[in-house]
Structure formats: structure tokens, C-alpha cells
Amino acid sequence: QKGMYLYFLYGLSYLISHTTFAGVFLLELVLAVFDLAGICRILELYVKKTTAYLLAPMVLGVSFASQSFYWGGSAEEICLPFLIWGLYLSLRYFGREYPHKAMSAKTLLAGGLLAGMVANIKFTSLGFFFAWMMCIAFSFLARRDFAGAVRACGIFLLGMALPFVPWVIYFALHGALYDWYWAYVYVNVFAYSNLNGEGPGLSERVYTLSKLLYWVARKNWGYF
């Protein structure tokens, strides 16, 4: 489930230090700055700027203290700034512009770019942006603007496609487009989850998932 930008960023970190995690630590610091800035902008939608400055570090601290980030350097941690800023764009629109104004093409394109980055880091985290675009599409449909909804989806998909361009060129030049698809999409969707092979039945899958969610919530009460 690990995408190209994840390897690219870790490759840059490796250039800083071949034998330590100094480069990865620097990468995490840079990402944390974007996390903090995004959290602050979200809070500013609801509270005074000074209050947002005080609360933002606390929110980030609680997030990093989560069991999900226990080991550090996970794909989810790399995705976090893109998810936070995507959340900010949607909250800003629905809090300050909807229903009087349609979401601008610039914001839709930005949302697509963020989704494209997540798709090339860990595509299974795209569920957030699927819901994001569905909400925007429904905001157009609520105004009976079907053409606007289609146009908005097109702009979003255009933005989402842009982060793929460097990798399409790279793998095409190396004659490895199919290998890219097979390793990143096919294996993760069909082989990794064992959907096509013999495995546990539906009831056992539900039981296992419920047990996992129980222990995750028990270790981190924030999930409640």
C-alpha cells in the first residue's frame, strides 16, 4: 500500500544521512509544520486567532501521541498534512461560503491535488477525499446545478491526476507502467487482502475486525 511519493520523500531523507534517521526526523519536522499550520487555520474558522495559536500545538500533540503514530514515519503520518488541509478547504467552504456561493475552481483543483498526493502515498487513505468530493457534488445538486456538479468533479479529477504525471512519465520511460499498476494497485486490492483466495468467512472477518477495533479504542481513548 506504499506509493511513489512515500519512497521519494524517504529517498530525499536518505540523501541527508545514509546511516541515521536524521533525514527522516527532518522530514517529520517539515510535515509537522504543515500539520500545525493546517490545524491552526481550521481552528481560526471557529475561534479567535490567539486562541487558535494556543490550541493548535495541543491538538497536534494529542494526534502524535496516538497509538497510530507510535512508531513514527508511517504512511499515515506522511498523508496527514494533505488530509488536514483538505479538511480545512471543506470546512471553510461549508462554514463561510455555502449555500450562497459555489466552490471555486481554484479550491476544487487544490482539493484534487491533495487527493492525488494521498493517492500516491497510500491510496487506501483516499476514502476521505471520496467523501470530500461527494459532499461538494451534493452541494451543487442541492442547488439543482447538475452541470456544475459534473464540472466540479472534472476539475477535482484533473487536480488529482497532476501528481501522477511525473510517475507516468518515469515508468513509461522505463517500460514499467504495467509493473507499477500491478505492484501498487492490483496486488494491494486483490492479492494483499486475499479477496480471491481461500480465507476466513464473512462472520470471522467481522469478528476479527471488531476485535481489532476494540483493542485500538482501548489503547487510545481518543477514538471514542
Residue positions per predicted region:
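Short acidic/glycine- and proline-prone juxtamembrane loop motifs at membrane-interface regions
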Residues: 69-78
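Short hydrophobic/aromatic helix or loop-helix immediately within or flanking a transmembrane segment
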Residues: 1-22, 29
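Membrane-lumen/periplasm interface segments of specific transmembrane helices
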Residues: 152-197
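Alpha-helical transmembrane segments at the extracellular/periplasmic loop-to-helix junctions
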Residues: 80, 160-164, 204-224
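Perimembrane helix-loop-helix junctions
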Residues: 128-164, 168
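Transmembrane-helix signature of polytopic, membrane-embedded enzymes
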Residues: 34-62, 80-81, 98-106
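Membrane-interface transmembrane helices that cradle and orient dolichyl/undecaprenyl
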Residues: 44, 86-110, 140-143, 215, ...
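Membrane-interface alpha helices of multi-pass inner-membrane proteins
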Residues: 104-123, 129-135, 158, 162
